[in-house]
């Protein structure tokens, strides 16, 4: 929550400004209405695919990972409903599979990484295997993830170690 406004003559009426937009209560916080018409969000990272039209994707603070078209040939421009949520949590990195843009790698807080298919809805989590029973992997809140520019099957992922997958994280 970044901002609160309390009506000076009616303390039951409060507006809450937060990472996802605004919440409005008229009963001192017992019930809230969230305005979903405001296109509000804070992206941590963004990426694009190579489709036509190309898509922008990225992780948003407290609002998961989203993907939408960069432009449209339809009158009225890009609509909010063109965007789709592909991963939950605090969204961070998102990157398309360079061989099949319907698959997107997505990461959320604490090193949670997975792959999501925008056509089928199929998803699965990816985690590097434990090195041994005594070594616990520690991930930064916003852990690193990258596609190898020379090998479409190789992705890198960071904890206190650099992890490398040569089979797209399978």
Show which residues each predicted segment covers.
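Beta-propeller blade termini and top-face loops
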Residues: 1-170
């Amino acid at each position: 929550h970044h901002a609160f406004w309390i009506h000076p003559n009616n303390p039951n009426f409060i507006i809450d400004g937060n990472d996802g937009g605004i919440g409005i209560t008229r009963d001192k916080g017992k019930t809230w209405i969230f305005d979903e018409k405001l296109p509000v969000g804070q992206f941590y990272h963004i990426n694009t695919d190579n489709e036509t039209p190309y898509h922008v994707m990225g992780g948003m603070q407290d609002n998961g990972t989203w993907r939408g078209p960069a432009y449209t040939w339809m009158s009225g421009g890009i609509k909010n409903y063109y965007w789709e949520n592909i991963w939950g949590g605090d969204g961070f990195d998102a990157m398309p599979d360079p061989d099949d843009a319907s698959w997107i790698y997505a990461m959320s807080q604490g090193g949670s990484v997975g792959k999501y298919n925008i056509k089928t809805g199929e998803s699965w989590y990816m985690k590097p295997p434990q090195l041994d029973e005594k070594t616990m992997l520690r991930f930064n809140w916003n852990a690193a993830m990258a596609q190898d520019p020379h090998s479409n099957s190789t992705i890198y992922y960071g904890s206190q170690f650099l992890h490398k997958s040569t089979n797209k994280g399978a």
